[in-house]
């Protein structure tokens, strides 16, 4: 068995090392990730700049590859340049901070990497862990965080995938781990509305010209059964099954056009 591991926090992030350590005795592992922090880049691919693959080592001295591009670029290189053959599973993470809700789904580089692998028929898992101080993710993910529980839960899922694959019609799993989980079970949850309510901060530079920061406050209005509610209200680890087919109900549009 072979696994490709990537992320959007960067190849030196604590979470990607934790993911590797969690499963490396189950399969052959190849780590290919962006060289720098790529949070919020979504499923973007680099088309207008040359890219480099730089061999590197993780903090445990194991081999990895840093790509001067996006998470999708890293997965593309992993699949078609570095590994040489299709892996049995692709793991994106362990991400620093949640990836929940419909609105943020396509902006997440963590999920973007998993989507890219899933588009080639590879069972994929995007896994993220809550951190109280969400801003630390912008420190290139290198802050020491205890990902041991998330690693344990990831290992459990990888074993199931190796045994059964993913169910028909499911292309990838979006997995989120609370900082203080109540148990070692998963709650299967649907996507909530969003992760943040956007906030735009307007400031002035020394010459009086405006510039802006986009931020947000946590969204806390998700109803029961959603990923946000299960994670934030119940402290339960969640799995949300996803499909790359975004096609809506075609018959409704045919009727609508009449």
From Swiss-Prot:
GO terms for molecular function: 5'-nucleotidase activity; metal ion binding; nucleotide binding. The keyword Membrane does not apply. It catalyses: a ribonucleoside 5'-phosphate + H2O = a ribonucleoside + phosphate. A divalent metal cation binds at residues 8-9, 39, 95. It is an enzyme of class 3 (hydrolase). Its cofactor is a divalent metal cation. Binds 1 divalent metal cation per subunit. Its EC number is 3.1.3.5. Keywords: Cytoplasm, Hydrolase, Metal-binding, Nucleotide-binding. InterPro entries: SurE, SurE-like_Pase/nucleotidase, SurE-like_sf. SUPFAM superfamilies: SurE-like. Pfam families: SurE (PF01975). Nucleotidase that shows phosphatase activity on nucleoside 5'-monophosphates. Belongs to the SurE nucleotidase family. This is 5'-nucleotidase SurE. It comes from Methanobrevibacter smithii (strain ATCC 35061 / DSM 861 / OCM 144 / PS). The gene is surE.
